[in-house]
Amino acid sequence: MLKNLPIQSVSWLSSLIVATIDFLSTFNLILFCVFSCCTRLRKCPATVQGFLVLGAAVKHGQVPPVLATRLDKAINCWKTHQSAKIIVSGGIVQKAKESEAEVMAAYLIAHGIPARKIIRENKALNTWQNLAFASQLIKPQETVVVVTSDFHVLRARAYARKMGLNWSFISSKTPWRYCPLTFIRDYLGIIRDHWWVFCGSTLFLLLVEFILK
């Protein structure tokens, strides 16, 4: 089909496709960043029976800054819900000697959380497994609040909905120097999981622009 089109038409069509994809990618990324930042405004529910802190990669047994913000958020919320348990979820990744859950538990204990209040889920290797494995440790009727980073809420909540988990989500603020990498990475993860939405939007805009041309 393209062989029968003039070179100018093919060039115009290629430019239109590139411009449309570029516009959608930029616009959706901005929306994603705005939504992610707005999740920080969400407060902890009045009744909480359990907190679930989603893990992140640890190095040399130390809690990295992004994960520390999640744990600090959970600690602050727990102070007003001290009857609640805290589940820390994360397995052994990247040839680490300890699971993310063990490192997270040690951090919580060092910051005043009683060891008896902490439950370790030490097998999960990704967000989907974090939620799936943790759900096996929680009774269906319990009120659960998931604590994760602002950039991570949208994808984690989408997974929870797919699993039928009616949990609340609160987020911690990502340190500025980690924002570019973490926000773009999770945005690309959302496109990967919902590629049909992105492709559909692209085709729709192309059709509109083609008609209006």
What are these regions (language model features)?
Residues L2-S9, I211-K213:
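Juxtamembrane "helix-exit" motif on the non-cytosolic side of transmembrane helices
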Residues S11-S15, A19, F27, L31-T182:
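A structural signal for short, hydrophobic/glycine-enriched beta-strand patches
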Residues W176-W195:
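Membrane-interface, cytosolic juxtamembrane amphipathic helix immediately N-terminal to a transmembrane helix
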Residues G189-K213:
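C-terminal single-pass membrane-anchor helix
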